[in-house]
Amino acid sequence: MNDTKQQPLLIVEDSDEDFAALTRIITKISTSNPIYRCEDGEEALDFLYREGLYADKTAPRPSLIVLDLNLPGTDGREVLTALKKDRDLQTIPVVILSTSSNPKDINACYRQGVSGYIIKPMDTQRLNKLVENFLSYWFEAVELPSSTIIS
């Protein structure tokens, strides 16, 4: 069994408030998961492809990606498309956390192979509960792919 307490988590989120809420919940559930943040799609692709500021080949491969769809510049839809087309990255589970409740977005994301789609509620307590349940599932119930690079 993988030690999910050590698995890196990539959060692609432009909202400081939403990122702060996510990290607060994550540290409540698991204090030792490394958390990486990218604020837009271009930064996320650089992180995943180890380009630009992330050109260090020892940069960790995330075992789980939490992706917002509505990002500045390259949006989450484009990040998801690139990720799922890449043989080395397509096995990383991606969970969408977005304000979009549009059935077209939800269906398109599932067609591209997301592992889950969570609509961000406006209520903070509801958001906390949803994220806590989702993270408990990912960190406690399932086996995540190894964070080591498979080439």
Where is each model-derived feature located?
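A Lys-centered signature of the CheY-like receiver
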Residues: 120
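The feature encodes the CheY-like receiver
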Residues: 72, 102
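Conserved phosphotransfer cores of two-component systems
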Residues: 56-60, 84-91, 112
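Active-site residues of response regulator receiver
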Residues: 67-68, 98
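Non-catalytic signal-transmission and effector/linker regions of two-component phosphorelay proteins
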Residues: 1-10, 15-36, 42-45, 49, ...
